[in-house]
């Protein structure tokens, strides 16, 4: 009899679920802002609890501002997962181990923000034993060195930020003002507004790096996610409107901001590549097309091209389910 394993990745903005039974899998991607809806998490998960034998869990939502501490977040998330499923729950930690839910609560810092490590361990076991894993999601970009199947990354988000292994820039949710405070416009180096007018999703859509369907987060102004709405938001970063700035000028402006995004990713990956003498890169996440532009000088292996877009958009949930499946098969 085949075992049904549910891999769950609970992020601050998105929850991703992978159902794995033997070689068959199905992936669910749900926009679920925990800072607004954390009390509805149990009900959400109950929609996926049919015939589940094991749950493999990773999380980053414990960092959401609905929780005062990581301890509170980890405990609350695990409690809600346990209530939603009538089966064993295993939580993947930053050391590459599966913990019982009780062990995970006691060692809450070890399971905090552990989703990147599940992806890295999966890549090391199933794809490439020496490489840099670059996972660009909606909000952040993980840059993980792997050598001889060993994940060499720092363990906490703070240490990863300090060592070029975590960049707080993503395909969708990053405010444009994070990318630059000045951009050349009409021949002059021009100051930009730091108001929450536009996000990387607007640039990504304008430049055809994502589809409207991929734009899953809320828009800064509550308006649409179409090309015209994205241009309308972007022009506000110049404290202007569509009557003052032509569309071709705005597209050029978007390209200049996009190049700043590419530079930010490239300089961090370059640092890791030199530090660990690595030149193969495995890319995954919503931002794969952006990563291809940023890292065109590297040997690239795409999870999207290897496993499909669904897996690329939900790699940690797929990875943690595959890793538990492998462990149970031993």
Swiss-Prot record:
Keyword presence, Transferase: yes
Family statement: Belongs to the MfnF family.
GO molecular function, one term: hydrolase activity
Pathway membership: Cofactor biosynthesis; methanofuran biosynthesis
Reactions accelerated catalytically: gamma-L-glutamyltyramine + [5-(aminomethyl)furan-3-yl]methyl diphosphate = (4-{4-[2-(gamma-L-glutamylamino)ethyl]phenoxymethyl}furan-2-yl)methanamine + diphosphate
Primary role: Catalyzes the condensation between 5-(aminomethyl)-3-furanmethanol diphosphate (F1-PP) and gamma-glutamyltyramine to produce APMF-Glu.
Keyword terms: Transferase
Protein name in the entry: (4-{4-[2-(gamma-L-glutamylamino)ethyl]phenoxymethyl}furan-2-yl)methanamine synthase
Cleaved signal peptide residues: none
Enzyme Commission identifier(s): 2.5.1.131
């Amino acid at each position: 009899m085949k075992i049904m394993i549910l891999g769950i990745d609970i992020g601050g903005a998105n929850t991703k679920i992978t159902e794995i039974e033997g070689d068959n899998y199905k992936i669910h991607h749900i926009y679920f802002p925990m800072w607004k809806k954390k009390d509805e998490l149990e009900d959400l998960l109950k929609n996926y609890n049919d015939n589940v034998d094991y749950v493999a869990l990773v999380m980053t939502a414990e960092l959401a501002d609905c929780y005062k501490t990581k301890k509170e977040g980890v405990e609350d998330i695990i409690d809600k997962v346990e209530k939603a499923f009538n089966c064993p729950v295993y939580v993947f930690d930053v050391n590459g181990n599966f913990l019982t839910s009780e062990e995970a609560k006691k060692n809450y810092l070890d399971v905090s923000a552990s989703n990147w490590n599940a992806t890295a361990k999966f890549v090391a076991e199933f794809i490439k034993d020496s490489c840099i894993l670059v996972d660009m999601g909606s909000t952040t970009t993980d840059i993980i060195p792997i050598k001889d199947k060993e994940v060499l990354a720092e363990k906490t988000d703070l240490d990863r930020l300090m060592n070029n292994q975590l960049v707080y820039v993503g395909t969708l949710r990053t405010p444009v003002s994070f990318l630059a405070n000045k951009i050349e416009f009409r021949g002059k180096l021009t100051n930009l507004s730091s108001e929450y007018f536009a996000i990387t999703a607007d640039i990504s859509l304008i430049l055809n790096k994502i589809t409207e369907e991929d734009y899953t987060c809320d828009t800064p102004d509550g308006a649409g996610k179409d090309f015209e709405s994205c241009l309308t938001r972007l022009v506000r970063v110049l404290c202007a409107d569509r009557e003052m700035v032509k569309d071709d000028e705005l597209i050029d402006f978007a390209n200049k901001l996009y190049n700043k995004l590419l530079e930010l990713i490239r300089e961090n990956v370059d640092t890791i590549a030199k530090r660990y003498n690595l030149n193969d890169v495995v890319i995954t996440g919503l931002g794969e097309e952006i990563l291809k532009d940023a890292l065109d000088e590297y040997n690239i292996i795409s999870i999207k091209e290897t496993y499909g877009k669904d897996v690329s958009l939900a790699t940690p949930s797929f990875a943690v389910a595959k890793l538990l499946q492998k462990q149970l098969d031993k």
